[in-house]
Amino acid sequence: MLKTNRSYIFFIVIGCLLFFSCKKEPQTESPTEDLSVSMLQKVNQLRNTGCMCGSTFMPPVTQLQWNKQLELAAQTHAMDMYSKNYFDHISPTGTIPIQRAETAGYTGTYVTENIGKNYTSVDAVMTAWQNSESHCKAMMDSMHTVMGAAVLHKYWVQEFGKE
């Protein structure tokens, strides 16, 4: 009986040690995954219903697909704007959206870019872009078939393209 009790105590102690010594890794999605889902969903909702872009009605158009190369181009541009403290479609070295997309491996034929700064959520930046005629028209352009986006320190970038 004493030997059985010692065995139980031994396994309980070992079990407790293992339980308390193992660290669980946090189960969170990366911001990129969250952004890709919510941004693509918001843009496609807009494209599904059509909308007013300034004084021009933009009719419904086909949904976009997510493109990892355009996402990388958006990430690169957001990082560049943040690290070099500028806000423009053309970098201080003269790089334009199509060049950034090609550098990221994008092989499509058409690239349009929206940028935003100091917005705190996808909803906020989407509202701002929808209220700007040129940004709204970029999101509604029927030539676009794919998109990628990124945010870094409140620098938002959308890249649209045609594959």
Predicted regions and their residues:
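Disulfide-stabilized extracellular recognition modules
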Residues: 108, 112-163
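Bacterial N-terminal signal peptides that target proteins for export
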Residues: 1-10
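Bacterial signal peptide processing site
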Residues: 23-26
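Short, surface-exposed glycine/acidic/tryptophan-bearing loops
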Residues: 69-121
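A short alpha-helix/helix-coil micro-patch that ends at or immediately precedes a cysteine
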Residues: 28-83
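C-terminal motif of bacterial Sec signal peptides marking the signal peptidase cleavage site
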Residues: 18-21
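Short, hydrophobic secondary-structure boundary micro-motifs
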Residues: 56-57, 89-91, 138-139
